[in-house]
Amino acid sequence: AFAASEGDTCGFPTTDQYIRIYERTGGNVSPRLASMRYGNDYYFASVYARRDSGIETLEDMNGKTWIYNETGSTSGYVLPHDVFKANGITVGGIVESGGHTNSMVALIEGQGDFCTGYGSPPLPPAEGFWAGWQWRYGMDPELWIWGKANNALYSDKKDRGMCVDLRRAVRKIYDLETVLTDIGVVMTMGPVPNDCLCFGPDFPTDIADTIVATIQDQFKDEAMKALWNDPNFYEWTAVNEITDSYYDSYRDLLGIEK
């Protein structure tokens, strides 16, 4: 749609979709706002599996059934597929679920051995020593959630942080405590710049500026900010102004030349 538009297209593409739009339009696309989620301008792909599955490393995924949402998804398919290919991983079967939440449901229901989807930095406990800390990529993706020493959730909820990754997406379907106990994060891939608001070829600059300013103003209004922050909507907690260079780290990650 972006490549074929006559100047009247804007949207909120995923990271990989944006890169493809850039390529299809010869760079004639303007990213203006990047999403922020809980203080982070990035996310990552995560591999999830049952903690008792025996899947603990990348090599353990050989011959197993892979659940992903759809082939256009950065975290669900594109990045994991490239990592699997680069490391000689051949899965035994695939289940295309149609959505991130569906992938986690399929994993819980035993339709596959592992699933891939978005990962998000855990949030620290609101009180105590860790309060106010900021998770950085490369740290334990289950920090403040799962105690590796005793192989269990932190029993004292005051010491436990908040899980905001794909497992949280099924909290209205399953008991989240049970999901976190049963399903773990095997590995992560990234980091990946967040999704954005961008404008297609020759989109009128004055209208684009108005849209950008309106969204920025909405984040100053508590009711509108709550709407943007809704996990069933975009789950944006803030926005940052960006240019195309914001996505250079993703190009580097996949070896894509600009």
Residue ranges and their predicted role:
Residues 1-28, 102, 122-127:
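Pocket-flanking alpha-helical
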Residues 2-5, 61, 106-108:
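Hydrophobic residues within well-ordered alpha-helices
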Residues 16-20, 56, 60, 79-83, ...:
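Extracytoplasmic/secreted proteins, especially bacterial periplasmic and envelope-associated proteins
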Residues 28-40, 184-188:
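A structural signal for short loop-to-beta-strand junctions that line the ligand-binding cleft
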Residues 33-57, 197-199:
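Hydrophobic/proline-rich hinge and linker segments of small-molecule sensing/allosteric domains
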Residues 49-65, 202-210, 217-219:
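Hinge/capping helix and adjacent helix->loop/strand transition within the periplasmic-binding protein
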Residues 53, 64-204:
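Pocket-lining segment of extracytoplasmic ligand-binding domains
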Residues 133-153, 157-163, 198-258:
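An extracytoplasmic/periplasmic, membrane-proximal ligand-sensing/linker region
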